[in-house]
C-alpha cells in the first residue's frame, strides 16, 4: 500500500486558528509518502533520517524524535477505542522537513490514512484531521490549531480552502490558473514547540478570557483598548488578520489579483511588526520578491524561520525564486530551497 500526504501553504490567516479564527490554506503537490504493509508491530525506515524505528503497540513512550508522530497517532487511536495493528514500511517523499510546510501534520495524516485503510477503521477526513491534531497536542506536545491537519485532509486539486476554525465550516475556492505560488524555504529550521509560539498562544487565550470571547472572530478593534499592551498588540494583529482573510476570500472569488497581493503584503508587515514571529531571512525574501515583480509575498506557517510564499504570474515563479536565492546566499549562510506549488488533493491511498 502507498499513501501520499501533501504539505500545505497558508495563503493568509496566520496564527489565527488557535483562537478559532479564519484561515485560507491549500494542500500542495509536495508529499510525505509511506509505502508499507500491515504488521504485528511497528517497523519503519525514514529515508530522510536514514534511520529505522521499531516499537510494540503496548509501549508508546515519547522518544523526542520522528517516531513520536507515529506513536502519537497510535496513542490517540487506542484512547479513542479503535482496534489497530502495526505497520512495516518506508517513509519518504519530497516535502522538506521543519520547513513551515506542515511536514509533521502531513506525516501524521499519512500514518492515519494508512491505518484507516489497513484496518478498515472507517474514519472520515474530518475524523482523521481531528485525531491528528489531538496526537500533536496531547502526545507530541505542540499546541497547534486545526489549520494544518484540515488542509491536508481536505485538500482539493486547483482549490484553496476557506475555513472557519471555530465551526469547521469550509468552502472550496478555485485558485486562478494564471497564478502560481512560489515557496521559498529559508533553510532556517524552526521548532514549532518553541517557547515563543506557546507564549503567544497563551497571551491570546488570556486576552480572549479577559474580553469574555470564545473566538477572535468576535473581537472588535474598540475592545482591544481594555487589554494590557502585549495582549493588545498580539490580539490586535489576529483581529486584523481575520478581516484580511475575509477580504482575501472575496478577492479570490472576484479574481482581483492586485487585492490578493496587497493583502498578503499587509499581513506580512503586520505579523512581523506586531506578532513578531518573522526573522531577517523571511523579511529579506518578501522584500526582494516584491522588488522582482511578485504580486504579493508573506511568511507562511508559524514563522521563526521556515518558509515564505510569493504570489506570481504563471510561469514566472522559478526564475524569480532563483534570482532571490542568488541574492539570499550572498547575505545569509543558509542554503534555501525554492519551488513552485499548485493546490493539490488531500491525503490519498493508492
Swiss-Prot record:
GO terms for biological process: galactose metabolic process. It catalyses: alpha-D-galactose + ATP = alpha-D-galactose 1-phosphate + ADP + H(+). The keyword tRNA processing does not apply. Mg(2+) binds at residues 104, 136. The active site is at residue 148. It comes from the Archaea. GO terms for cellular component: cytosol. PROSITE patterns: GALACTOKINASE, GHMP_KINASES_ATP. ATP binds at residues 46, 98-104. Its EC number is 2.7.1.6. Its main location: cytoplasm. This is Galactokinase. It comes from Thermococcus kodakarensis (strain ATCC BAA-918 / JCM 12380 / KOD1). The gene is galK.
Amino acid at each position: 500500500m502507498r499513501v501520499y500526504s501533501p504539505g500545505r501553504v497558508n495563503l493568509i490567516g496566520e496564527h489565527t486558528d488557535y483562537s478559532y479564527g479564519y484561515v485560507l490554506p491549500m494542500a500542495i503537490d509536495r508529499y510525505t509518502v509511506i509505502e508499507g504493509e500491515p504488521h504485528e508491530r511497528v517497523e519503519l525506515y525514514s529515508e530522510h533520517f536514514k534511520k529505522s524505528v521499531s516499537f510494540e503497540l503496548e509501549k508508546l513512550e515519547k522518544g523526542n524524535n520522528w517516531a513520536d508522530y507515529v506513536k502519537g497517532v497510535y496513542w490517540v487511536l487506542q484512547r479513542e477505542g479503535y482496534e489497530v495493528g502495526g505497520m512495516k514500511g518506508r517513509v519518504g517523499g519530497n516535502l522538506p522537513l521543519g520547513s513551515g510546510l506542515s511536514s509533521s501534520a502531513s506525516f501524521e495524516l499519512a500514518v492515519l490514512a494508512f491505518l484507516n485503510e489497513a484496518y478498515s477503521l472507517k474514519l472520515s477526513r474530518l475524523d482523521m484531521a481531528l485525531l491528528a491534531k489531538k496526537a500533536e497536542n496531547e502526545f507530541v506536545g505542540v499546541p497547534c490549531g486545526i489549520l494544518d491537519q484540515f488542509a491536508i485532509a481536505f485538500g482539493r486539486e486547483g482549490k484553496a480552502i476557506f475555513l472557519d476554525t471555530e465551526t469547521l465550516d469550509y468552502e472550496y475556492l478555485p485558485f486562478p490558473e494564471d497564478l502560481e505560488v512560489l515557496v521559498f524555504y529559508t533553510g532556517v529550521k524552526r521548532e514549532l514547540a518553541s517557547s515563543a509560539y506557546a507564549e503567544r498562544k497563551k497571551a491570546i487565550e488570556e486576552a480572549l478570557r479577559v474580553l469574555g470571547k470564545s473566538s477572535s472572530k468576535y473581537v472588535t478593534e474598540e475592545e482591544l483598548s481594555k487589554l494590557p499592551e502585549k495582549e493588545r498588540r498580539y490580539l490586535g494583529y489576529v483581529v486584523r488578520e481575520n478581516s484580511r482573510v475575509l477580504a482575501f476570500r472575496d478577492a479570490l472569488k472576484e479574481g482581483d489579483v492586485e487585492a490578493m497581493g496587497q493583502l498578503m503584503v499587509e499581513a506580512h508587515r503586520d505579523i512581523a511588526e506586531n506578532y513578531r514571529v518573522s526573522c531577517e531571512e523571511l523579511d529579506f525574501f518578501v522584500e526582494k520578491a516584491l522588488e522582482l515583480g511578485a504580486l504579493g509575498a508573506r511568511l507562511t506557517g508559524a514563522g521563526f524561520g521556515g518558509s515564505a510564499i510569493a504570489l506570481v504570474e504563471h510561469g514566472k515563479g522559478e526564475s524569480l525564486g532563483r534570482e532571490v536565492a542568488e541574492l539570499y546566499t550572498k547575505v545569509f549562510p543558509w542554503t534555501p530551497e525554492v519551488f513552485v506549488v499548485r493546490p493539490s488533493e488531500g491525503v490519498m491511498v493508492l
